[in-house]
A protein has these predicted regions:
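Flexible assembly/topogenesis modules
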Residues: 1-153
Length: 153
């Protein structure tokens, strides 16, 4: 089970390398609802309801800031809520048991779980889009003197 999941949406042309488009322009494409499910249950809370046109995105922005910072990190994303709405839109889910991004609880995480993402859009997307999913996992990597590599999954 990953410690953190980050979801981004980008225009497919930009993702495929169109020279006139920025592949790091992560847009919201008027997502109306987004929910991550862990083993069939909404995680960490019920579905987020968004309204980008009217600026109602505070909950997702708050989750973005908390999940990327955590209480054990000195990293604070330098993204304002206006930037979040205009091209820095990342949906971040902290999957750690304490919801603080802590690596100290690896033993409490289920090794195997089913994760599902549901998204609904307020209107038809203007172009084809690509969903990028990044998961962060903490594993133990051992390299022995005979150059054998062992990864503890």
């Amino acid at each position: 089970m990953p410690q953190r999941i980050i979801i981004a949406l980008v225009e497919t042309d930009a993702y495929l390398g169109a020279r006139d488009k920025n592949p790091f322009n992560f847009q919201h494409f008027n997502v109306r609802e987004i929910c991550l499910y862990k083993d069939g249950m909404p995680f960490p809370r019920p579905m987020a309801r968004l309204d980008f046109k009217n600026g109602k995105v505070a909950e997702s922005y708050h989750n973005f800031m908390l999940a990327l910072k955590g209480s054990y990190s000195r990293f604070v994303p330098n993204v304002t809520i206006d930037e979040f709405k205009e091209g820095f839109t990342l949906f971040v889910y902290d999957m750690s048991p304490d919801q603080l991004g802590s690596v100290n609880h690896e033993s409490l995480l289920n090794r195997y779980s089913n994760v599902r993402l549901e998204m609904k859009f307020a209107e038809k997307t203007p172009t084809s889009i690509t969903l990028l999913a990044y998961s962060e996992r903490y594993h133990l990597l051992k390299i022995f003197e005979d150059r054998r590599v062992n990864i503890d999954l």
